[in-house]
């Protein structure tokens, strides 16, 4: 097998090993969940980005076309399988095959299932070959500082694990609304719909 192919496969495996990244965040969630009820399972909702007619980013390599929607789903399934080996953890997925779900529908599904954490999984593309690595977006501190703090802690834990797998560290980030969208308390909202709606629904939302 060529060296380039080996490197690519290693990176793909690192992506699938994102299953381990969520495990890294479990202690943070357990502290919060056990404050309410030690018997209550931790509910994690995985959101494989895109789906159906929305293919997301696309990359051609070695004669094959890879679509983001498919890679996101594969990673989510690997994460779910790994997470379900832990006692006291319940995992849901916003989609289990190739179909489209609206952004609002994804968070509504998480809320319906009593989510403690919502994790959207994405793989970006760039025309610049030097752009690579991983980052995690988490909620800002506005409107509900507790959710913001929890989200930041889990985001950092996930990012640490991804960096340990060999991915370039692009940091843990927040992105505020650029259109002056506000939370109910008139504070500046988060930019990303799934993070904003997760916060107003009572749980932290991340984008990995």
Q: Model-derived features: where do they sit?
A:
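Active-site-proximal helix/loop segments of hydrolytic enzymes
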Residues: 38-41, 66, 70-208
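Sec-dependent N-terminal signal peptides
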Residues: 7-25
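Short glycine-rich His-centered loop
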Residues: 41-65
């Amino acid at each position: 097998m060529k060296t380039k192919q080996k490197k690519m496969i290693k990176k793909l495996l690192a992506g699938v090993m994102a299953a381990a990244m969520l495990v890294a965040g479990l202690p943070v969630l357990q502290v919060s969940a056990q404050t309410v009820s030690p018997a209550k399972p931790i509910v994690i909702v995985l959101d494989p980005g895109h789906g159906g007619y929305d293919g997301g980013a696309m990359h051609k390599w070695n004669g094959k076309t890879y679509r983001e929607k498919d890679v996101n789903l594969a990673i989510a399934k690997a994460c779910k399988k790994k997470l379900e080996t832990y006692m006291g953890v319940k995992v849901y997925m916003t989609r289990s095959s190739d179909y489209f779900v609206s952004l609002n529908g994804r968070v509504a599904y998480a809320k319906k299932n009593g989510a403690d954490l919502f994790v959207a999984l994405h793989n970006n593309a760039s025309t610049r070959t030097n752009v690579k690595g991983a980052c995690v977006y988490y909620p800002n501190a506005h409107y509900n500082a507790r959710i913001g703090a929890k989200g930041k802690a889990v985001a950092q834990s996930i990012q640490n694990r991804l960096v340990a797998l060999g991915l370039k560290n692009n940091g843990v980030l927040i992105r505020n609304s650029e259109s002056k969208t506000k939370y109910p308390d008139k504070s500046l909202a988060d930019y990303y719909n799934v993070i904003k709606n997760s916060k107003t629904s009572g749980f932290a939302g991340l984008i990995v």
